[in-house]
């Protein structure tokens, strides 16, 4: 547990614990802040750009980030992942659109799925000839590094080219256990990139960001965007 309960400004806690300041928000900031719905032809699929799609494979995460752009759906009551029927329809949509070459698995956190369901999704996508790249967006290696098991890395290796975007926010998250999980993924030939959200009171100073970026590079994770 990285959270210091005695520190009201703990940078890890501020990512996940509610703050009264969140109540000061406009409706458009909470309903669909990045406009996914207008680009969603099917349940669980966002087709915003011609050659790539976002495939939402689950509603669940190991933690619930206060800044999540899909907070309206993440953690909602229902099945752990979208219904298999909906997922099959979304994959059929991808198969029927040859212009799509890049599929990003998101949600929720795809690595919160069990190995069997995750591999079923990867196998279905890899069987589509025009899908060149599969990406997985996840915070699981950061908050639950024990999820990155030898069995999981063996599964992921079967579906190259496969990339992972990991969600890092503060240098305190780069524990030895997290670095080991990243090493397992990197050793499996998976390019690792970091997505970082700029958060007031968490990482909005040069020193913290420098520490984070240097720690990421040392863990074989390329800082991708801030």
Kindly give the residue locations of the regions a language model identified:
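Short, structured patches in soluble enzyme cores that scaffold and shape functional sites
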Residues: 59, 69-72, 107, 138, ...
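Domain-level signature for proteins that mediate thiol-based redox and metal-cofactor handling
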Residues: 44, 78-79, 95
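N-terminal pre-triad scaffold of radical SAM enzymes
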Residues: 39-70
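Flexible, acidic/Gly-rich N-terminal and inter-domain linker regions that tether
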Residues: 1-48
């Amino acid at each position: 547990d990285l959270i210091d309960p005695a520190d009201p400004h703990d940078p890890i806690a501020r990512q996940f614990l509610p703050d009264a300041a969140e109540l000061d928000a406009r409706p458009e900031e909470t309903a669909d802040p990045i406009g996914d719905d207008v680009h969603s032809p099917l349940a669980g699929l966002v087709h915003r750009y011609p050659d790539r799609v976002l495939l939402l494979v689950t509603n669940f995460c190991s933690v619930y980030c206060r800044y999540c752009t899909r907070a309206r759906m993440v953690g909602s009551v229902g099945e752990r992942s979208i219904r298999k029927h909906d997922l099959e329809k979304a994959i059929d949509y991808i198969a029927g659109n040859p212009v799509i070459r890049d599929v990003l698995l998101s949600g929720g956190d795809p690595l919160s799925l069990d190995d069997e369901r995750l591999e079923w999704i990867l196998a279905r996508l890899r069987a589509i000839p025009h899908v060149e790249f599969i990406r997985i967006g996840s915070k699981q290696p950061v908050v639950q590094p024990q999820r990155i098991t030898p069995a999981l890395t063996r599964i992921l290796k079967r579906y190259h080219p496969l990339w992972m975007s990991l969600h890092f926010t503060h240098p305190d998250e780069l524990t030895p256990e997290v670095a080991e999980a990243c090493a397992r993924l990197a050793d499996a030939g998976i390019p690792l990139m970091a997505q970082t959200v700029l958060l007031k009171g968490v990482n909005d100073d040069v020193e913290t960001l420098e520490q984070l970026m240097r720690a990421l590079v040392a863990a074989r994770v390329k800082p991708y965007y801030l």
